[in-house]
Amino acid sequence: MDYKETLLLPSTTFAMRANLAELEPQRFKKWFEQNYAYEKMKENRKNAKKSFTLHDGPPYANGHIHIGHALNKILKETIIKTHYFKGESVRFTPGWDCHGLPIEQQVEVKLGEKKKSLSKKEIREFCRQHASEFVDIQREEFKDLGIIADWDKPYLTMKFEFEAAIYRTLCEIAKKGLLCERSKPVFWSWAAKSALAEAEVEYQDKEDYSIFVAFDLDVKACEKLGVSKASAVIWTTTPWTLVANQAIALNPNENYVITKEGLIFASALLKSMVEKGLTSGEIQKELNAKEFEKLEAINPLNGRKSVLIMGEHVLMDGGSGLVHTAPGHGEDDYYACLKYGIEVLMPVDDSGCYDETLRAKGLLPSHLLEEFIGLHIFKANEKILELLGEKLLHSSKFIHSYPFCWRTHKPVIYRATKQWFILMDEPKLQGKTLRECAKEQLLKTTFYPQSGVKRIGSMVENRPDWCISRQRDWGTPIAFFRDKNTKEVIFDDELFDFVAAIFEKHGADAWWEFEIKDLIPTNSKYKAENLEKVYDILDVWFDSGSTFNAVLNSGLYDAGEKRASMYLEGSDQHRGWFQSSLLVGTAINESAPYESILTHGFTTDEKGQKMSKSKGNVIASEYVAKTYGVEILRLWILLSDYSSDLKISDNILKQVGEQYRKIRNTIRFLLANTNDLKDLEVKEFSFIDKWILSRATKVFKASKEAFFAYEFAKGFSLLLNFLSADLSGIYLDISKDRLYCDSENAQRRKSAQVAMALMAKELLNLLAPNLSYSVDEALEHANVLIKGDAKDVFDLSLTQDFDYDFGIDDTFLMSAREKFFEQIDILKKDKIIKSTLELNLNISFNKFPNEELADWFMVSQISNENEEILAEFEVENEKFKITKASLCKCPRCWKLQSKNEETPCLRCEEVLKGVQC
């Protein structure tokens, strides 16, 4: 007889091999047809008591998505779905940042020389087309990753109504008195010919000069100091700015010496000056810094006067203690000179070259003007050093961290120009400053990880006023009018509203296309001929910082609550989007636009190195999807500590693939062994089933709590350990005998099946937010007792607790099992046995049912017969004797319980009677 035909072997149509790369696109297509998945999620939770809104930080509509984009969007979508399966109403409106330098630069490359002949309107139209093209490209690339969002109704910062909303936000800030136009040094990208905000600057190592220059004090100054001659020795790392020197700053709290050579240094730095060979160190006089205040020195380059001033910014950690001060080229310099009413000179044009200011202000001798006017500043350093002659006391080169433009990757400069600023320290918000209010809001915000609040807090504490103006073409205009005669900017509600309405209908292009008379109301008190336009555009960080107002507060989108539950981006956005949104939100609403902030790290190769094409270590999300499957990409993210940088490589993805197979095969085993289950009624669970259900209760609860706290790696670690060690490693293995060999309706078999069905149901619920594709697929092959009324994954829920804790203390059994298998390893190694079914276990206690104890140790039976003892061990004073089973092997179940060879054991004999009937 072929006994195999009599076994109740597992059966399921749920495939062992997932074929993810091949099959995922088909399922994703179904999810996105008529926005099926997202709309169903909305419909299923329309009566939910709680809601969760994740406001999407907009990527640039420029280029294809990379692995970092995939990390970001998958993490967002997983959190959205976590809240959905918790029973909450969710909203996820994706968006794109469509303005700004990255897009404009790409268009410039496409247009080449043709750009020079185009109007601003035409250039902006090319930018709009470029952005539209990449919105469509990126949207499809995100959908290829199975990311569920409101893809049919995204927000685009270049939409007409959006530009109007950004402009209205700007006007609100202006009306609060927080907007100011002034000439001030700002980061300037000469390569992009535009001002930059702090968030648009990245720091790299750069080699520069370190020079010490003697500025001779004039006769009056020497007389006042009671010396025949003296020279202020300044230190600088930017020789090219010396032509614009207006002052020399000293620290008011320090003492300064005049050496025997007549050189002035800070007392605290005299020793280092001696070491550099600048002086012998012999002191002629020592005075407090304030004794030098308002004395005048002579600039050796041009003979112009340079005033000695006090500056708290002057440090004693390097240099001479006297700082070269050019108010047009440094923020500290600017503020220090402002107190003394010193003129700001700016002899550098927008492309980083010296301009006619050199001639107009006499900043260089006339015979040098032709050589220097039009010369790029970074090519002037050596020439300046040569001109200094003997006044150059010391020169060396050093490498330091220097600001670079984030897009052109060229070093930036400080350049004083007229710019628009949002003021950080004016008490305009109910007597408080924007800085104070923003810091208060941060304390009310939940951060994941918690360290984020300190990081952004220190940035807000120390940041300067926000420069929001740019001198480019593609962006939202700072659409204000200026009085032609007085040059005063006009802040008028009627004008604001009229321009906003025009933008809403015609887009911000109207600012360039329309004449002034068409941009003001017909009966306006202002006359078009007396007005002129401000043509600067807004920093793109203002655009994105205003998105909460344009998306959540405008009513134009079904995007959820007016205040986002969460903002989620890379950790670099502490200085970017998180901060710009905080400042804009606090300025107009006196409230942060978010309740919580979650940050993730960046993607690196397996060695922790940044990915780059030149290194050949780039792994694209498309490659992962087509090679391994999106589900593997998702699991890689969820198994990683996303708060730090995430390493990715083929080796790592293969390891993740193994973990995925472990999950999939466990689900498959559970489905296959519950296929013929008719109901979930069981009189009483067997001890082993109570044990696994108790373990599952603890693990499922802990995993769920971890997932709800966005600690996905922790949740999966708990879950995978349970699946490997307890479920697959013990329970499923020891349950095979009763599942396959007991009769179909046997109580022991039914108990195991019900336990498995309950665990399978909860496991699918737990995995639904994280591995939605696999769960959706599994449901198609699951017993109705597991899937219930669910037509697909979006009908599942995590609202019910899995509560099957029978209070089992398994300490004794787990310890006994461990010691048992230590002995088994020895017996197998010595080739005494091949299988534990060749054994019986002899015990003297009666704590557990013998039949279940035999299953626990996977022996043929618990016996008290005098059989050959092969090994023994002890646990908690209870003795275990491993003996050689004396009965014959059952040809059906393979246990040594038969009285005769080739004869079924009593259990199998009874089962076979039922089969034959």
Curated annotation (Swiss-Prot):
It holds the Pfam family Anticodon_1. Keywords: Aminoacyl-tRNA synthetase, ATP-binding, Cytoplasm, Ligase, Metal-binding, Nucleotide-binding, Protein biosynthesis, Zinc. A motif ('KMSKS' region) lies at residues 610-614. Its EC number is 6.1.1.5. It is found in: Cytoplasm. InterPro entries: aa-tRNA-synth_I_CS, aa-tRNA-synth_Ia, Anticodon_Ile_BEm, Ile-tRNA-ligase, Ile-tRNA-ligase_type1, Ile-tRNA_ligase, M/V/L/I-tRNA-synth_anticd-bd, Rossmann-like_a/b/a_fold. The keyword Translocase does not apply. Zn(2+) binds at residues 890, 893, 905, 908. Binds 1 zinc ion per subunit. PROSITE patterns: AA_TRNA_LIGASE_I (PS00178). A motif ('HIGH' region) lies at residues 59-69. CDD domains: Anticodon_Ia_Ile_BEm (cd07960), IleRS_core (cd00818). The keyword Cell cycle does not apply. It catalyses: tRNA(Ile) + L-isoleucine + ATP = L-isoleucyl-tRNA(Ile) + AMP + diphosphate. SUPFAM superfamilies: Anticodon-binding domain of a subclass of class I aminoacyl-tRNA synthetases, Nucleotidylyl transferase, ValRS/IleRS/LeuRS editing domain. Its cofactor is Zn(2+). L-isoleucyl-5'-AMP binds at residue 569. Monomer. Belongs to the class-I aminoacyl-tRNA synthetase family. IleS type 1 subfamily. HAMAP family: Ile_tRNA_synth_type1. Catalyzes the attachment of isoleucine to tRNA(Ile). As IleRS can inadvertently accommodate and process structurally similar amino acids such as valine, to avoid such errors it has two additional distinct tRNA(Ile)-dependent editing activities. One activity is designated as 'pretransfer' editing and involves the hydrolysis of activated Val-AMP. The other activity is designated 'posttransfer' editing and involves deacylation of mischarged Val-tRNA(Ile). This is Isoleucine--tRNA ligase. It comes from Campylobacter jejuni subsp. jejuni serotype O:2 (strain ATCC 700819 / NCTC 11168).
